[in-house]
């Protein structure tokens, strides 16, 4: 008797919770993930010319770079990063130097002026 009440209670709670969408998992798009990973780079991009990127910035850049495997990934991420770069209104020189300063061989140049259609297959 007690066991059947416990099972009924668990079923009732499960049904109730499913109606509340408590178990819904929201995932980020690759662009949103990259934007989150590169947020620490904003301090460098807006800093004086002699500034260096933080370890968190470089780590984020490396993770984004390692996450793009295919041509479509590279092209989509290029569009994402170029759009985000245009919003930051930082100096193109800073974008150009970021991969070098972080020692990351980036899949494509980053910055608001880069033409993503020139990425090679």
Curated annotation (Swiss-Prot):
Disulfide bonds: 31-80, 41-57, 58-102, 78-116
GO terms, molecular function: lipid binding
CDD domains tied to this protein: nsLTP1
BP term (GO), one: lipid transport
Keyword Signal belongs to the record: yes
Entry-linked InterPro entries: Bifun_inhib/LTP/seed_sf, Bifunc_inhib/LTP/seed_store, Plant_nsLTP
Family annotation (SMART domains): AAI
Keyword Signal annotated: yes
Entry-linked SUPFAM superfamilies: Bifunctional inhibitor/lipid-transfer protein/seed storage 2S albumin
Keyword line: Disulfide bond, Lipid-binding, Signal, Transport
Signal peptide: 1-27
Pfam families registered for this protein in UniProt: Tryp_alpha_amyl (PF00234)
Family named by the database record: Belongs to the plant LTP family.
Summary of the function given for this chain in its UniProt record: Plant non-specific lipid-transfer proteins transfer phospholipids as well as galactolipids across membranes. May play a role in wax or cutin deposition in the cell walls of expanding epidermal cells and certain secretory tissues.
This protein's name: Non-specific lipid-transfer protein 9
The species this protein was found in: Arabidopsis thaliana
Organism lineage string: Eukaryota, Viridiplantae, Streptophyta, Embryophyta, Tracheophyta
Gene name, Swiss-Prot/TrEMBL: LTP9
């Amino acid at each position: 008797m007690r066991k059947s009440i416990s099972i009924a209670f668990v079923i009732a709670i499960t049904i109730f919770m499913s109606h509340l969408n408590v178990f819904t998992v929201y995932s980020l798009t690759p662009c949103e993930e990259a934007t989150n990973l590169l947020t620490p780079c904003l301090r460098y991009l807006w800093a004086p010319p002699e500034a260096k990127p933080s370890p968190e910035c470089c780590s984020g850049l490396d993770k984004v770079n390692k996450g793009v495997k295919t041509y479509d990934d590279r092209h989509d991420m290029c569009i994402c990063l170029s759009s985000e770069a245009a919003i930051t209104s930082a100096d193109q020189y800073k974008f150009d130097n970021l991969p070098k300063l972080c020692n990351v061989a980036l899949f494509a140049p980053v910055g608001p002026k880069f033409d993503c259609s020139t990425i090679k297959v």
